[in-house]
Amino acid sequence: MACVSHWLLLLSLASATLSRPLWSERNGLIEMENSIRLGGNIILTPSEATANQKLMTVKGAEFKEAESTGLFPPSMHFFKARPLIQQSHVFSILHQMPKGGALHLHDFAILSVDWLVKNASYMADCYMCLTRDGGVRFLFAKPAPVGMLPPGCSEWILLETYRKKLGDVTEFDKGLIRNLTLLTDSPEPHIPSQDEIWRRFEGAFITASGLICYAPVFKEYFYESLRELYEDNIQYLEMRAMLPPVYELDGTVHDQFWSMAIYRDMANKFVGAHPDFLGAKIIYTVHRHEDLAQVTEAVHLAMKLMEAFPEIMAGFDLVGQEDAGHSLYQLSDALNIPSKLGVKLPYFFHAGETNWQGKDVDENVLDALLLNTTRIGHGYALLKHPVARNLSLELNVPLEICPISNQVLLLVSDLRNHPAAVLMAEGHPLVVSSDDPSIFGAQGISYDFYEMFMGIGGAKADLRTLKKLAENSIKYSALSKEGKEKLTEIWQKKWDKFIKDLAMNWKKEL
């Protein structure tokens, strides 16, 4: 950055003394701008250079087609763009690319909802009730539940019996799937405001929780989530988890320590079967609607979980709609407790997930940094706070960019206009993730990589950009030095194979 400032100073001095445009400096300035872009300073190997040439040929062809048809997926709502992305050769390449770690995903919105409906809801003793607004709630019980109805719900219906009476079970299951996602063919008129989309968004979590919080489903859901991420060529997961009570048919209710032990054991089981996957860590979260006393209690619990599960517990965060919840400053007395006690509790705060400016909610980006956050979730408002932006750079605190989430939750419509476009151009530390892919109708993080590469990064984003994003996911993870080295080793082997396949085999006619 000092080099850039030096060049700009010389240019301004020259412009002050000369009346003619300094066209002789144009190429140098463009080259300088390209060099400071995210990944711009990476020197590609010969094989990577060949692979990059093929990648950019494919990307250029898709840009040209978009200009001809007027259909450019990053400029469209994801629900409409999704089938176009699935047909994209660029997307196919990104799916095959080893992406390192997925660092921003939420516990009950990782695995495709098809699995929940086609597997969990077909398990014995699964009951359903219908809400007044057309939604559903689930409960496992034996014998049949008496009472225990959520507000505004019908009587409990045993799904096994109900399905036997249906003429079209497939259509019924499609209806259940719709209740677990936000997918719609016409997103614009059906989603009028941020408050409404957040109401539906959190409703999908509530619906899913009735299935996932049943202990047998809880275990398999996490294992299958790891499998789906693995199939998307992800080598490591950091998952935000609220650790709600998990129940058994006999009435036993498990606490947060039980859930953490299950996450640890299932992750170890998956790694045992897939040694080219490093594992998972958990970021314990509570809702930002909770009051100071409740957050204080949660912080104390987080410290206990850190002590009990040092190998899998990564830290603490607050979740939920920022505009409607408490700000970090309002909860600072609770969040300052670990530092006052001399206890290490890393923070991974959601901050600045808002369109507002000059309110408590967008000042969360500054307060997150003052609270020594390890990463910033979303950070959509960071551009409006130059001091926080510079502090983030100085402290080397990355933003977790989740493009599809930001679009679906109505922060931005055309992803070419996402604030991360500016941050990428400046070389700001960033990682890519997918937040809640199952609710958005996505899987893994390849869809978000596509939006980042094609839309936010613009035409000049290339293999260096992708490599830097993957490397950042390792560099800025919560892993120890040894863990990062091991993950780098796993990723590098896969990266080298990916480059070889792309350079030598993929679309040989290019």
UniProtKB/Swiss-Prot annotation:
Span-the-membrane segments of this chain are none
This entry carries the following GO cellular component terms, namely:
extracellular space
Which co-factors does it depend on?
A: Zn(2+)
**Which CDD domains does the record match to this protein?**
ADGF (cd01321)
GO BP annotations, alphabetical order:
adenosine catabolic process; inosine biosynthetic process
Tell me the superkingdom of the source: Eukaryota
Q: Which residues bind substrate?
A: D107, W198, R199, R200, F201, E202, G203, A204, F205, H287, G320, D436
Question: Does Magnesium show up as a keyword for this record?
Answer: no
EC number, UniProt record: 3.5.4.4
Active site (record annotation)? E353 (proton donor), H378 (proton acceptor)
UniProt-annotated location(s): Secreted
> Which leading EC class covers this enzyme?
hydrolase
* Pfam families registered for this protein in UniProt: A_deaminase, A_deaminase_N
Cysteine pairings via disulfide bonds: C129-C153
Binding note for cofactor: Binds 1 zinc ion per subunit.
List the carbohydrate attachment sites. N119, N179, N372, N390
Q: Select a single GO molecular function from the record's annotations and give it.
A: proteoglycan binding
Q: Which residue positions does the secretion signal occupy?
A: 1-19
Its function, per the record, reads: Adenosine deaminase that may contribute to the degradation of extracellular adenosine, a signaling molecule that controls a variety of cellular responses. Stimulates cell proliferation.
Query: Any extra detail in the entry?
Result: Morpholino knockdown of the protein results in reduced body size, abnormalities of the body axis, and changes in expression of developmental marker genes.
UniProt lists the family membership as follows:
Belongs to the metallo-dependent hydrolases superfamily. Adenosine and AMP deaminases family. ADGF subfamily.
Query: What is the protein named?
Result: Adenosine deaminase 2
